[in-house]
Amino acid sequence: MSSGESHQEQLSQSDPSPSPNSCSSFELIDMDASSSYEPVSPHWFYCKVLDSKELWIPFNSEDSQQLEDAYGSGKDCNERIVPTDGGRYDVHLGERMRYAVYWDELPSEVRRCTWFYKGDKDNKYVPYSESFSQVLEDTYMLAVTLDEWKKKIESPNREIIVLHNPKLMVHYQPIAGSDEWGSTSTEQGRPRSVKRGVENIPVDIHCGEPLQIDHLVFVVHGIGPACDLRFRSIVQCVNDFRSVSLNLLQTHFKKAQENEQIGRVEFLPVNWHSPLHSTGVDIDLQRITLPSINRLRHFTNDTILDVFFYNSPTYCQTIVDTVASEMNRIYTLFLQRNPDFKGGVSIAGHSLGSLILFDILTNQKNSIGDIDSEKGSLSSAEDRGDASTLEEDLKKLQLSEFVTVFEKEKVDREALALCTDRDLQEMGIPLGPRKKILNHFSARKNSVSINRPAMSASEVNISKENGDYLDVGIGQVSVKYPRLNYKPEIFFAFGSPIGMFLTVRGLRRIDPNYKFPTCKGFFNIYHPFDPVAYRIEPMVAPGIEFEPMLIPHHKGRKRMHLELREGLTRMSMDLKNNLLGSLRMAWKSFTRGPYPALQASETAEETEAEPESSSEKSNEANTEEPPVEVKEEAPISVGMLNGGQRIDYVLQEKPIESFNEYLFALQSHLCYWESEDTVLLVLKEIYQTQGVFLDQPLQ
């Protein structure tokens, strides 16, 4: 073997790779290049316009996968409608639009996103259009396959995207376009980062909501179109409330979720402000509004006047009709979209919305249709015992001879209660009988002032022909209350002025035996600094002074500043009691007369001081024992409005809020939407009706 041949063999052994000139060499290069390219994984986004700015929000992972499956299903994909966001929105694939299902909302644009660029004024990434994203993807595939980079792509709006390498891709926005001679300026603005695939951009993508819905809650807003200090709508605030509930289910009902006992609670908003102000009343108000302090007057017309609208017979009817019809409509639509739903329904109201729901609930009828025949009707025991006919009433008044007159005029007992002195005179009733009749029904109204609080806070007579018409004599307007298509299980009131409105209407107390005709539970939840909130329990038990139930912190125990405050209070009380006891003993010994012998006086003082000190100790012990006895042995009776349970529940203020109550007053009235403590109480009470409890009871 020659030296040249041996050298060639060594080269071949040391470098086993094929020669670049061979055909197999090209095939290997193409295989390596093509294998390094992987198609991009798309993710679906929708666009929300907030403050005239477009914000692209990703669908959760489950919804995005459903949209992608529908997109790749075939030719009919453009006709597909995919429910998203727990069934609250529908995406029309052909239109690439997202529509709200249960409420009115402007549709949102939907995109199948693969390529993104960083926005101008923030660090949020904006997706390219689907068509241009496909151009970028094709160019990227060629660059990776052929290993040829620094490719320039011009977008439809004449912007330049440069692919330097897989890690560096930039977007240039030209400062000036072509001039009048057709020449194009080469000056470019600040480059913006370009990313391929949603996994390469900073964005939070949630896993999605459980498919199983255990309970449905309707949420009614208060005055005005805005529900918090950020001027957000009821839809946005309820979205926050729902998000908090999903997080709390994972942290406080983890065992039940792992055992697949529970799914989630659906919260749906009910809007009555827009239908009310679409009646043309805003135009009428604008004509009489003074031109000065325009913004303040506009705010007043749009918000505070809602309270006066509710006290107007015309607009009160519009409000209750809107709330009831909206809840019935949404409930029917919800059942159509969720045919397997077997859970219960509850309602929640914030501020004035809670009063609207309170009045609607008190004017419902049970399934039999006769409220007075059911246990727990609005009438008191005295009123139920006096549920006589018109003939019996006239017989008691010794006016039986006028029965035929009333029958001829088709006046029944309820209609007679509505008659005035002039009406009776026109029917030919003499002055004496007229006074007897009017005095009789006036006395009945005054005697029933407590037993029908929910019936618009006054004595209410229910017509036999139409049980929804109310005769109200102490301030509440007379309207026809619609019937709900379901029986709510629990009524939650957030920051509610119900107690104040009932008092203003002339109601001083609530019958302890009263309960809603169709609703079993009632929780009055409020922040201690909320200027709009009022208590309910003192109206049920006016002779007893007691504190509301303190809502536990969602992380357990009380807030540290509250525990510290209670500890200091107890310490000061102990010091005060000890000091007073010492001063009392010294004063008694000082005012006691002198004894003949010093020793005798000392022994006498000792013998008297011992029972006194023991009595002081026993008194101190007695002063410390009653709170324990009240909590354990003597539960407070607050009537049947909440099934015998407590009604008033107060939140714990935050440490910073305790420094100045007035500074946080307005915020306290709007804090419920994002309050974990409020949401956890709602979830706890709802799931208790299903036999599901917290993983660990809160203290």
Curated annotation (Swiss-Prot):
<feature type="compositionally biased region" description="Polar residues">
    <location>
        <begin position="1"/>
        <end position="11"/>
    </location>
</feature>
<dbReference type="GO" id="GO:0034389">
    <property type="term" value="P:lipid droplet organization"/>
</dbReference>
<keyword id="KW-0443">Lipid metabolism</keyword>
<dbReference type="GO" id="GO:0005829">
    <property type="term" value="C:cytosol"/>
</dbReference>
<protein>
    <recommendedName>
        <fullName>Triacylglycerol hydrolase DDHD2</fullName>
        <ecNumber>3.1.1.3</ecNumber>
        <ecNumber>3.1.1.-</ecNumber>
    </recommendedName>
</protein>
<dbReference type="GO" id="GO:0090141">
    <property type="term" value="P:positive regulation of mitochondrial fission"/>
</dbReference>
<dbReference type="GO" id="GO:0008542">
    <property type="term" value="P:visual learning"/>
</dbReference>
<dbReference type="GO" id="GO:0007626">
    <property type="term" value="P:locomotory behavior"/>
</dbReference>
<keyword id="KW-0378">Hydrolase</keyword>
<comment type="similarity">
    <text>Belongs to the PA-PLA1 family.</text>
</comment>
<feature type="domain" description="WWE">
    <location>
        <begin position="30"/>
        <end position="112"/>
    </location>
</feature>
<feature type="compositionally biased region" description="Low complexity">
    <location>
        <begin position="12"/>
        <end position="25"/>
    </location>
</feature>
<comment type="function">
    <text>Diacylglycerol (DAG) and triacylglycerol (TAG) lipase that is required for proper lipid homeostasis in the central nervous system. It cooperates with PNPLA2/ATGL in neuronal TAG catabolism and hydrolyzes sn-1,3-DAG downstream of PNPLA2/ATGL. In vitro, also acts as a phospholipase that hydrolyzes preferentially phosphatidic acids, including 1,2-dioleoyl-sn-phosphatidic acid, phosphatidylcholine and phosphatidylethanolamine.</text>
</comment>
<dbReference type="GO" id="GO:0120516">
    <property type="term" value="F:diacylglycerol lipase activity"/>
</dbReference>
<dbReference type="Pfam" id="PF23464">
    <property type="entry name" value="WWE_3"/>
</dbReference>
<dbReference type="GO" id="GO:0004806">
    <property type="term" value="F:triacylglycerol lipase activity"/>
</dbReference>
<feature type="domain" description="DDHD">
    <location>
        <begin position="484"/>
        <end position="688"/>
    </location>
</feature>
<keyword id="KW-0597">Phosphoprotein</keyword>
<dbReference type="InterPro" id="IPR001660">
    <property type="entry name" value="SAM"/>
</dbReference>
<dbReference type="GO" id="GO:0016020">
    <property type="term" value="C:membrane"/>
</dbReference>
<keyword id="KW-0963">Cytoplasm</keyword>
<dbReference type="Pfam" id="PF02862">
    <property type="entry name" value="DDHD"/>
</dbReference>
<feature type="region of interest" description="Disordered">
    <location>
        <begin position="599"/>
        <end position="635"/>
    </location>
</feature>
<dbReference type="GO" id="GO:0000266">
    <property type="term" value="P:mitochondrial fission"/>
</dbReference>
<feature type="domain" description="SAM">
    <location>
        <begin position="383"/>
        <end position="445"/>
    </location>
</feature>
<dbReference type="InterPro" id="IPR004170">
    <property type="entry name" value="WWE_dom"/>
</dbReference>
<keyword id="KW-0333">Golgi apparatus</keyword>
<dbReference type="InterPro" id="IPR013761">
    <property type="entry name" value="SAM/pointed_sf"/>
</dbReference>
<dbReference type="Pfam" id="PF00536">
    <property type="entry name" value="SAM_1"/>
</dbReference>
<keyword id="KW-0442">Lipid degradation</keyword>
<dbReference type="GO" id="GO:0005794">
    <property type="term" value="C:Golgi apparatus"/>
</dbReference>
<dbReference type="GO" id="GO:0019433">
    <property type="term" value="P:triglyceride catabolic process"/>
</dbReference>
<dbReference type="GO" id="GO:0005793">
    <property type="term" value="C:endoplasmic reticulum-Golgi intermediate compartment"/>
</dbReference>
<dbReference type="GO" id="GO:0034451">
    <property type="term" value="C:centriolar satellite"/>
</dbReference>
<feature type="region of interest" description="Disordered">
    <location>
        <begin position="1"/>
        <end position="25"/>
    </location>
</feature>
<comment type="subunit">
    <text>Forms homooligomers and, to a much smaller extent, heterooligomers with DDHD1.</text>
</comment>
<feature type="modified residue" description="Phosphoserine">
    <location>
        <position position="447"/>
    </location>
</feature>
<feature type="active site" description="Nucleophile">
    <location>
        <position position="351"/>
    </location>
</feature>
<dbReference type="InterPro" id="IPR004177">
    <property type="entry name" value="DDHD_dom"/>
</dbReference>
<feature type="compositionally biased region" description="Acidic residues">
    <location>
        <begin position="603"/>
        <end position="613"/>
    </location>
</feature>
<dbReference type="GO" id="GO:0046872">
    <property type="term" value="F:metal ion binding"/>
</dbReference>
<dbReference type="Pfam" id="PF02825">
    <property type="entry name" value="WWE"/>
</dbReference>
